Curated annotation (Swiss-Prot):
Catalyzed reaction equations: isopentenyl diphosphate + 2 oxidized [2Fe-2S]-[ferredoxin] + H2O = (2E)-4-hydroxy-3-methylbut-2-enyl diphosphate + 2 reduced [2Fe-2S]-[ferredoxin] + 2 H(+); dimethylallyl diphosphate + 2 oxidized [2Fe-2S]-[ferredoxin] + H2O = (2E)-4-hydroxy-3-methylbut-2-enyl diphosphate + 2 reduced [2Fe-2S]-[ferredoxin] + 2 H(+)
GO molecular function, one term: 4 iron, 4 sulfur cluster binding
InterPro entries documented for this protein: LytB/IspH (IPR003451)
UniProt-recorded name of the protein: 4-hydroxy-3-methylbut-2-enyl diphosphate reductase
Length: 319
């Protein structure tokens, strides 16, 4: 039986960003240095495939520090943690490694700098997301006000409209964030803006790659976890760009094939915590059902790398 023709357009860049790659290496190197088990507070990155692989290697994932014994090392996830977490680890004399993405740490430092200068912070982010919790937890309670939508801006009650600054979660929709920033600047003209955009390069690049696909495709598949903020934003970007079908799938087994009937051009993107092996799995699934042509649509090359913490570098360099 002849397979129907279909073109897969692969978004590039896609998949692992430098912060995710660094965080995964930290867990792997910690296991090599200290042996299993190594405890990780929260999923190191939001991807089940990655977490399951590290669990098989000996990582134990917990949600709170008190679930980890004091005699084993603990790693903080790439999303960042409130200041109270490392303080508690030190109080308990625990060995810990902070895998917070350096670009998230930059936002933390930015918030602290503004706080020291007497400014009240407004954070654009998603309530309950670990990154938002970690960033807001850098300052005393009440010093950071959270907004999620343009509508939230109207309801803000600030101490002094002349003494404000805003920061953002690094994995937001660029377009949605721009609208919220515009609302903030309209209501609070004196608000201090970041020296550099807080939304990270990888989020920006992956959303740009999806937009570049949009005029060629009828459907979009985003490979990523449902709790991955940046992956969910890619689905939203695809829908906003006019994709009739935009699915978020963790594995090829989750693809809704019925929704792809009659489709001849599909875009494939991957969130910043999705490994390339899952992209290969999706391509293989399409080749089983379609006469598949694969085309790469590359918008930018990424060359960003982040070093792992010194405690692990020294272990790796020791002969």
């Amino acid at each position: 039986m002849t397979k129907p023709p279909l073109t897969l357009y692969l978004a590039a860049p896609r998949g692992f960003c430098a912060g995710v790659d660094r965080a995964i290496k930290i867990v792997e190197m910690a296991l090599e240095k200290w042996g299993a088990p190594v405890y990780v507070r929260h999923e190191i990155v939001h991807n089940k495939f990655v977490v399951d692989r590290l669990r098989d290697m000996g990582a134990v994932f917990v949600e709170e520090l008190d679930e980890a014994p004091t005699d084993r090392p603990v790693i903080f996830s790439a999303h960042g943690v409130p200041k109270s977490v490392p303080a508690e680890a030190e109080r308990r004399n625990m060995v810990y490694v902070d895998a917070t993405c350096p670009l998230v740490s930059k936002v933390h430092l930015e918030a602290e700098r503004h706080h020291e200068n007497g400014l009240q912070m407004i954070m654009i982010g998603h309530a309950g997301h670990p990154e938002t919790i970690g960033t807001m937890g850098q300052l005393p309670e009440g010093e950071v006000l959270l907004v999620e939508t343009v509508e939230d801006v109207a309801g803000l009650e600030v101490r002094d409209p002349e003494r404000l600054a805003y920061i953002t979660q690094t994995t937001l929709s660029i377009d949605d964030t721009a609208a919220i920033v515009a609302a903030l600047r309209e209501r609070f003209p004196a608000i201090n803006i970041p020296r550099k955009e807080d939304i990270c390069y990888a989020t920006t690049n992956r959303q740009g790659a999806v937009k570049a696909l949009s005029d060629r495709i009828e459907a979009l598949l985003v490979i990523g976890a449902p709790n991955s903020s940046n992956s969910r934003r890619l689905v939203e970007v695809g829908r906003a760009a006019g994709c009739r079908v935009a699915q978020l799938v963790q594995r090829a087994t989750e693809i809704d094939w019925d929704s792809l009937q009659g489709v001849t051009a599909v875009g494939v993107a991957a969130g910043a915590s999705a490994p390339e092996v899952l992209v290969d799995e999706v391509i293989a699934a399409f080749r089983e059902r379609f006469d598949t042509t694969v085309e790469l649509v590359e918008t930018v090359k990424e060359r960003v790398e982040f070093k792992v913490p010194r405690i692990l570098r020294e272990a790796a360099e020791t002969p």
